[in-house]
């Protein structure tokens, strides 16, 4: 077993072989083939090219070297084109800290039965006077950077559940084509994570409308992994066992504590929102997340809200500003 597999259990190594075409005997050769392609993109600054880093891109693209390199190039190109987003991508950045403390994103301690990490977004918590959409996106990207250091998650992947309960039409009207495209480029096109599913629950009609509008920007593979459950959670439980879910989603775990992930990343900074030190989390150091204690069963239904690379693949920030910045949904 190569040192790059250190810490992986035999079952996960076998899963990597069967599902991702990962071969321990040719691992270093596969990595070097991707590294050798870097010279073909002198327009991009590849700031990290070590074996462990390149390996996560190979896993994200099932060891197709060309696709892995394209993803690697888009990862750094996205950061070059959006320098302000990544200038201080740390948990103690004021904007990121506010987003984390408001639960963007939530991260469950328990994984699902396939070993996937479960991320939560409670959309109605978006206070637009407090958090910009970009800062929420930055907090999500930082969280993914932290989590993807875990080799088990590089192979098993992630699940995202978005609860749209009480997400108002007014909030939805603030979502513009440019910021939605920024999120799609950052999460779908430029990050080495395997997303096994994106689950919408309690989505109102205007989220269906938003999803229809952004569908053309989604890859076919992404579209097939988006599930619209509405307010009946039986279909969600067919894909994610209730034992892995908090009570908000009809699961057997206690209600999700919005501060769990923020406390993990911020450490002693969590309780003081006005002081920002350099002792908090960054993308290099990984801390252990405290375990969550199981609770009692909860109902199966939730109330519906009354109130979704080649050069030039990614756009420069100034180009986005020149795009249509009108909301996708307009208030009367």
Curated annotation (Swiss-Prot):
Location(s) in or outside the cell: Golgi apparatus, trans-Golgi network membrane; Early endosome membrane; Cytoplasmic vesicle, Clathrin-coated vesicle
Boundaries of every CRAL-TRIO domain copy: 96-257
GO molecular function: phosphatidylinositol bisphosphate binding; phosphatidylinositol-3,5-bisphosphate binding
Membrane topology: Peripheral membrane protein
Location of the region described as Disordered in the Swiss-Prot/TrEMBL record: 300-332
Entry-linked Pfam families: CRAL_TRIO, CRAL_TRIO_N
Comp. bias regions, Basic and acidic residues: 313-323
This protein's record includes keyword Membrane: yes
GO (cellular component) term, any one: early endosome membrane
CDD domains from the UniProt entry: SEC14
PANTHER family reported for this sequence: ALPHA-TOCOPHEROL TRANSFER PROTEIN-RELATED (PTHR10174), CLAVESIN-1 (PTHR10174:SF72)
Entry text on domains: The CRAL-TRIO domain is required for targeting to the membrane and for binding PtdIns(3,5)P2.
Note: Binding to PtdIns(3,5)P2 is not required for localization.
Function comment: Required for normal morphology of late endosomes and/or lysosomes in neurons. Binds phosphatidylinositol 3,5-bisphosphate (PtdIns(3,5)P2).
Protein's recorded name: Clavesin-1
